[in-house]
Amino acid sequence: MKALMFKAPLQAVLTERDVPEPAPGEALVKLAYNSICGSDLSFYKGVWHGFTYPVVPGHEWSGTVVEAGGGAADLVGQNVVGDLTVACGSCRHCTVGKPTLCADLQELGFTRDGACAEYMTVPTGNLHRLPEGLSLREATQVEPLAVALNAVDRLAVTAGEKVAITGAGGIGLLLAQAVRLRGAEVTVLAEPVTERRQAAHALGVPHTVGGDPGELVGFVEKHPELTPDVVLEASGYPLAVQEAVEAVRSGGRIGLIGYRIEEAATMAPHHIVVKVLSLQASMGPGDRFGEAIELLAAGAVDVDALLSHEFGLADHDRALDVALRRADGNTRSYFNLRA
């Protein structure tokens, strides 16, 4: 089979390898699509945490089960998506339902081979069946939508609240829709790339600003009636954290969802103290996979604005380049693994 491998920083190679054999408790999935996440790009550059070279990347995927043993034989022929988290199940974090914090965490696409290939093995407990009518292309966004829903709920976003978002990549655009689904309103979104701001407008965000320092704060100063109760930081850029701290209302909440490890964030702690702000981090999909599948199947979430550029694995260099440069109106590149 063909598989894309990250061998070292900025070294992506298309390889030929044997189809993997599923271990007990695993299924073999014939992959259909995989979208490129911002974390994949950081991994590609060599500036990420908890990864292993060489490895096949990819964790936002869809496919069809072709082999499953034991009590999971009924999965064969089913279209599925899956959680990237492979937890031990027995450490103190796992036993209280927090597998993302597992002491021996493994992740598909980071520490074990992921979905930028024709086939992949996955623990059967990680799989979620897809209903008829939900396309495999759209289903690549189940995992990131679950991430967005989990973040909005961890921030306890409720009906009637005003929310600002920094960053309009895939997660930022899904956050905008997750906020709406919870009955709150995205009043403004900050994003430097014109096409991504246009995508946000197409999804119903009424106001956008660029990503330069001070633009979000300046907007709030001009429109105090739109001062956000919550700011969701989805860009991962350090300056956006300080911007969020200054823009949110006193007593408000800041959600840290995007992050990068290349640069450290610098902020003025007195803003947090004097304004009595709450900062809440969120990582991973939590237990929102089922809801994400239902929402996509019902057409309640638009992913066409996200899936902007399709590539085959053979064109991986261009796919990664376009995604890294956010070029040609890119919001999210994805691989058609059946091409």
From Swiss-Prot:
<keyword id="KW-0479">Metal-binding</keyword>
<feature type="binding site">
    <location>
        <position position="143"/>
    </location>
    <ligand>
        <name>Zn(2+) 1</name>
    </ligand>
</feature>
<keyword id="KW-0520">NAD</keyword>
<dbReference type="InterPro" id="IPR013154">
    <property type="entry name" value="ADH-like_N"/>
</dbReference>
<comment type="function">
    <text>Catalyzes the oxidation of 2-deoxy-scyllo-inosamine (DOIA) with NAD(+) or NADP(+), forming 3-amino-2,3-dideoxy-scyllo-inosose (amino-DOI).</text>
</comment>
<dbReference type="InterPro" id="IPR050129">
    <property type="entry name" value="Zn_alcohol_dh"/>
</dbReference>
<comment type="pathway">
    <text>Antibiotic biosynthesis; paromomycin biosynthesis.</text>
</comment>
<feature type="binding site">
    <location>
        <position position="88"/>
    </location>
    <ligand>
        <name>Zn(2+) 2</name>
    </ligand>
</feature>
<dbReference type="InterPro" id="IPR002328">
    <property type="entry name" value="ADH_Zn_CS"/>
</dbReference>
<comment type="pathway">
    <text>Metabolic intermediate biosynthesis; 2-deoxystreptamine biosynthesis; 2-deoxystreptamine from D-glucose 6-phosphate: step 3/4.</text>
</comment>
<feature type="binding site">
    <location>
        <position position="102"/>
    </location>
    <ligand>
        <name>Zn(2+) 2</name>
    </ligand>
</feature>
<dbReference type="InterPro" id="IPR013149">
    <property type="entry name" value="ADH-like_C"/>
</dbReference>
<dbReference type="InterPro" id="IPR011032">
    <property type="entry name" value="GroES-like_sf"/>
</dbReference>
<dbReference type="InterPro" id="IPR036291">
    <property type="entry name" value="NAD(P)-bd_dom_sf"/>
</dbReference>
<feature type="binding site">
    <location>
        <position position="37"/>
    </location>
    <ligand>
        <name>Zn(2+) 1</name>
    </ligand>
</feature>
<keyword id="KW-0521">NADP</keyword>
<feature type="binding site">
    <location>
        <position position="94"/>
    </location>
    <ligand>
        <name>Zn(2+) 2</name>
    </ligand>
</feature>
<dbReference type="GO" id="GO:0016491">
    <property type="term" value="F:oxidoreductase activity"/>
</dbReference>
<dbReference type="Pfam" id="PF00107">
    <property type="entry name" value="ADH_zinc_N"/>
</dbReference>
<protein>
    <recommendedName>
        <fullName>2-deoxy-scyllo-inosamine dehydrogenase</fullName>
        <ecNumber>1.1.1.329</ecNumber>
    </recommendedName>
</protein>
<feature type="binding site">
    <location>
        <position position="59"/>
    </location>
    <ligand>
        <name>Zn(2+) 1</name>
    </ligand>
</feature>
<dbReference type="GO" id="GO:0008270">
    <property type="term" value="F:zinc ion binding"/>
</dbReference>
<feature type="binding site">
    <location>
        <position position="91"/>
    </location>
    <ligand>
        <name>Zn(2+) 2</name>
    </ligand>
</feature>
<keyword id="KW-0862">Zinc</keyword>
<dbReference type="Pfam" id="PF08240">
    <property type="entry name" value="ADH_N"/>
</dbReference>
<keyword id="KW-0560">Oxidoreductase</keyword>
<comment type="similarity">
    <text>Belongs to the zinc-containing alcohol dehydrogenase family. DOIA dehydrogenase subfamily.</text>
</comment>
